[in-house]
Every structure is written in structure tokens, then in C-alpha cells.
Amino acid sequence: MGFDPVTFAKIKKISIDSNADGYIDYANQAGNADKLDGKDASDFLSIDSFKDLKEDNGYIKFPTGLIMQWGKVYVNNTTSYQEIPVNFTIEFPNKCLNVFASIYEGSGVDNDYIKCITRIANITTKGCVVCITDISGASGDVGFFWFAIGY
């Protein structure tokens, strides 16, 4: 189904002449859609309204109040079970909604590993506890990444 200028003109009640002045006039009457509410689109969101720290342990604060944080924790212990405290980069003003963690195995000795992240506990606005099992190696090049979201 294509565009039919005659049907469009009848629906919009504009006149058509041979050089399409009617379409141009209709477009001019519509005005700047960006200013319909009196504001530019750029008034709603500026790059300055985002706050962030782009580091291994960092965060981004969105203008809506949503905060995403991330970090990396190294583990130097060879115990079979460990509860590792995680301190968020910044405190969430209201609530931490969720925390995710994933295993990190760096370039250390081949037998350095963490077998499993069993759970994430004690989630607060300031941090949480990540529980890991079957830790092997003490080179300091194993651990986990964490990611938290809140407001």
C-alpha cells in the first residue's frame, strides 16, 4: 500500500497544486514538533545529568535516580567455603534491588579457581555478602565480578 497524495489531501483538507505547495504549507502549519510542549528534547536530558565513575569498581547514576554499580573482588584463600563481604562503590540512597556475581579466573596458575557462587546474602544499601565454594589457589588472581542495581 503506497502513499496517495489525493487521499492525503482530502483527509487533511489541504489543497494540492502542481508544485506541491499544499504539502509544504501543511508542514509549516504543523510547526516544530520538538517545541509542542514549549521545551526542546535536549531540555529533558543532558549529559551533565549523569554521574559516573568509570573504574574497575564504579557506578553510573541516571537522572531518574536509578543507580548501577559494579566491581571486582579478589580471593586469596584456599578454603572450601567462604563468605566474602562486598562494599558497594557508593551507598544506594533508598534500596538495592538486586546483586549479580560471576566468577573471575585471571591469568594465574592453572589450578587456581572458584568452583561456585552459592548465594548472595545480606543485601543492604551499602553492600552484600557473596558466598563461594571450592576455592583453590592463593595467587590472588581469582575472584568474582559483582553488579548491583538500585535507587
Curated annotation (Swiss-Prot):
Q: Name one Pfam family in it.
A: Gp53-like_C
What is the official name of this protein in its record? Answer: Uncharacterized protein MJ0347
Q: Which organism is it from?
A: Methanocaldococcus jannaschii (strain ATCC 43067 / DSM 2661 / JAL-1 / JCM 10045 / NBRC 100440) (Methanococcus jannaschii)
> According to the entry, what is the taxonomic lineage of the organism?
Archaea, Methanobacteriati, Methanobacteriota, Methanomada group, Methanococci
